[in-house]
């Protein structure tokens, strides 16, 4: 990461991310979509355990996309949730998005900032189904002229190599 940002800018970006998390927890998906840049890349890959000797050599095992979504694809996911026909979300999940260790730095692109956060996403469904997703997110956010923000990129890295939940219908 390049140069760190001022405390005020760090605070504004953190508040944007906290607000975004609350929109997801409150199932305000249309409001959440409004926070996304038209060029959003929303990605998650499989996590593969690499041997220490391979990591030292810089060798990473191949991964595959769990999702690699555009804004249009995210809109379709949300439209499906809104139909009541998304059986993975019947009854709807209750989620809590916790983000911490927020690091913000400048990029080479004016008004675009790189953000690294650790996250814990708790999901409860039905009476006994609970899932924890833990990892790191690598986001890029864009500051608009009116000092509002848009999420430009989100790369979600799970710590878990094996996903034990029944599905991945939640948004990170």
UniProtKB/Swiss-Prot annotation:
Name any Gene Ontology BP term: 3-phenylpropionate catabolic process
Identification of the protein by name: 3-phenylpropionate/cinnamic acid dioxygenase subunit beta
Q: Which domain of life is it from?
A: Bacteria
Which Gene3D superfamilies does the entry link to? Answer: 3.10.450.50
Molecular function terms from GO: 3-phenylpropionate dioxygenase activity
The organism named in the record is Shigella flexneri
Pfam families in the cross-refs: Ring_hydroxyl_B
According to its UniProt record, this protein's enzyme class is oxidoreductase
What is annotated about its quaternary structure and interactions? Answer: This dioxygenase system consists of four proteins: the two subunits of the hydroxylase component (HcaE and HcaF), a ferredoxin (HcaC) and a ferredoxin reductase (HcaD).
């Amino acid at each position: 990461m390049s140069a760190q940002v001022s405390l005020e800018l760090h605070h504004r970006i953190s508040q944007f991310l906290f607000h975004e998390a609350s929109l997801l927890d409150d199932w305000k998906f249309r409001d959440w979509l409004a926070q996304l840049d038209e060029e959003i890349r929303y990605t998650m890959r499989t996590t593969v355990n690499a041997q220490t000797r391979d990591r030292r050599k810089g060798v990473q095992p191949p991964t595959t996309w769990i999702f690699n979504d555009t804004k249009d694809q995210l809109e379709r996911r949300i439209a499906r949730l809104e139909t009541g026909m998304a059986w993975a979300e019947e009854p709807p999940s209750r989620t809590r998005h916790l983000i911490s260790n927020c690091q913000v730095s400048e990029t080479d692109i004016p008004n675009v900032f790189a953000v690294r956060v650790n996250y814990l996403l708790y999901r409860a469904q039905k009476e006994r189904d609970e899932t924890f997703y833990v990892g790191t997110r690598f986001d890029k956010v864009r500051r608009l002229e009116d000092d509002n923000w848009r999420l430009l990129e989100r790369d979600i890295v799970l710590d878990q190599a094996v996903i034990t939940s029944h599905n991945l219908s939640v948004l990170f």
